[in-house]
């Protein structure tokens, strides 16, 4: 009987660890679909996507790590992508030229629609 109880406890712990690892990966690394304003990375190498919908302004903020901030899917809005430590990729080329890409202390690349969207803190600027 004790062996069965010990096996059940071990299975519960194993399931909790496996399931918890997936939830942890969604918040501390990998891809984040933003749901809030502002949307802030957690400090790992991450890809942040702007909130869903045209006309929805976003503020994506990188943390330490080499982050990719993607605010180029939806248009007719004023998005801001702000880099932090690390080599960040800030993409605000959504076709409306109303956005802002602000590099941080790392070596950041800003992809924009027009020169006015790129701050002088972007080490590399690409126009698309």
Regions found by a protein language model. Name each.
Residues 36, 43-45, 52-56, 64-66, ...:
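Extracellular, beta-strand-rich repeat scaffolds characterized by small/acidic residue-biased motifs
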Residues 100-101:
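Short Cys/His-rich zinc-binding micro-motifs
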Residues 26-32:
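Cleaved targeting-peptide boundary
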Residues 21-25:
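Sec/Tat signal peptide C-region and signal peptidase I cleavage site
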Residues 8-18:
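Bacterial N-terminal signal peptides
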Residues 1-9:
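Bacterial N-terminal signal peptides that target proteins for export
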């Amino acid at each position: 009987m004790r062996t069965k109880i010990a096996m059940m406890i071990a299975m519960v712990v194993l399931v909790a660890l496996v399931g918890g690892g997936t939830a942890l990966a969604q918040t501390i690394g990998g891809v984040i679909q933003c749901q809030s304003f502002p949307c802030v990375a957690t400090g790992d190498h991450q890809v942040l996507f702007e909130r869903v919908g045209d006309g929805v302004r976003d503020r994506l903020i990188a943390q330490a790590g080499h982050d990719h901030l993607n605010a180029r899917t939806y248009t007719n809005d004023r998005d801001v992508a702000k880099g932090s430590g690390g080599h960040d990729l800030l993409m605000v080329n959504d076709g409306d030229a109303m956005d802002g890409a602000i590099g941080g202390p790392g070596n950041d690349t800003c992809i924009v629609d027009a020169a006015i969207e790129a701050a002088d803190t972007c080490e590399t600027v690409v126009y698309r």
